[in-house]
UniProtKB/Swiss-Prot annotation:
One of its GO terms (biological process) is cytoplasmic translation. This is Large ribosomal subunit protein eL22A. Pfam families: Ribosomal_L22e. Belongs to the eukaryotic ribosomal protein eL22 family. It comes from Dictyostelium discoideum (Social amoeba). PANTHER family: 60S RIBOSOMAL PROTEIN L22, LARGE RIBOSOMAL SUBUNIT PROTEIN EL22A-RELATED.
Length: 116
C-alpha cells in the first residue's frame, strides 16, 4: 500500500492596531512597534519572533503577521501595557473595530459632562 503524504497548510493571521485617531500624535508609533517587538512571547520566550511573527509599521498603523496560533487579546493586553508605560492610559482606550483590528480612541469625556 503506497504511503500518502499529507501537506500541512500554515494558516496566516494578520492583526492591525490603528493609531490614527489620537490627534496631536500622543502615541509614538515607532516606539510602540519596538515595544511589541521586545515584548511578544513565542513559545514562552521573549525575543523569539524569528520568521513566525512579523511586525511592520505603515504610517500610523502597526501590522502583525503570524504563521502560528496567536491571540488578538494578547495584542490588546500589550497595547494597554504600552499605554500605561507611556502614562497615556487615562486618555486612550483600545477598541476592537473589526475581527482583526484594534483602534486607539479617546475616552468620551464630553458626553458624560453634558449628561450631569
Amino acid at each position: 500500500m503506497p504511503s500518502v503524504q499529507k501537506t500541512v497548510v500554515k494558516k496566516s493571521h494578520k492583526f492591525v492596531i490603528d493609531c490614527t485617531a489620537p490627534a496631536g500624535k500622543i502615541v509614538d508609533v515607532a516606539a510602540f512597534e519596538k515595544y511589541l517587538h521586545d515584548r511578544i512571547k513565542v513559545d514562552n520566550k521573549v525575543g523569539n519572533l524569528g520568521s513566525t511573527v512579523v511586525i511592520s509599521k505603515d504610517k500610523s498603523k502597526i501590522i502583525i503577521n503570524t504563521t502560528i496560533p496567536f491571540s488578538k487579546r494578547y495584542l490588546k493586553y500589550l497595547t494597554k501595557k504600552f499605554l500605561k508605560f507611556k502614562q497615556i492610559r487615562d486618555f486612550l482606550r483600545v477598541v476592537a473595530t473589526t475581527k482583526n483590528t484594534y483602534e486607539l480612541r479617546y475616552f468620551n469625556i464630553g458626553d458624560s459632562e453634558s449628561q450631569e
